[in-house]
Curated annotation (Swiss-Prot):
It is a single-pass membrane protein. Coiled coil: none annotated. InterPro entries: UPF0154. This is UPF0154 protein lwe1321. One of its GO terms (cellular component) is plasma membrane. Belongs to the UPF0154 family. Residues 57-66 have a biased composition (Polar residues). Its main location: membrane.
Length: 79
């Protein structure tokens, strides 16, 4: 009787751990393919702040954000 409870708890924990890692991998690939901010969103944000965004300024900000994301990736891998 107690073996069934023990096996059930072990299976539950294994399912939770497996589900967590599968969901984490899915979300990381989703965010890599669909970044949370794009040029149109950046242009809209700048317009809301009262700035008239030029394409050069938008490209500079996008490249700065991409560099920041690339810079953070190695830090996360080391942990």
């Amino acid at each position: 009787m107690w073996i069934y409870i023990l096996v059930g708890i072990i299976c539950l924990l294994a399912g939770l751990a497996g589900g967590f890692f599968i969901a984490r991998r899915y979300m990381m690939s989703y965010l890599k393919n669909n970044p949370p901010i794009n040029e149109q969103m950046l242009q809209m944000m700048m317009a809301q702040m009262g700035q008239k965004p030029s394409q050069k300024k938008i490209n500079q900000m996008m490249s700065a954000m991409n560099k920041q994301q690339e810079k953070e990736k190695p830090k996360k891998a080391k942990k």
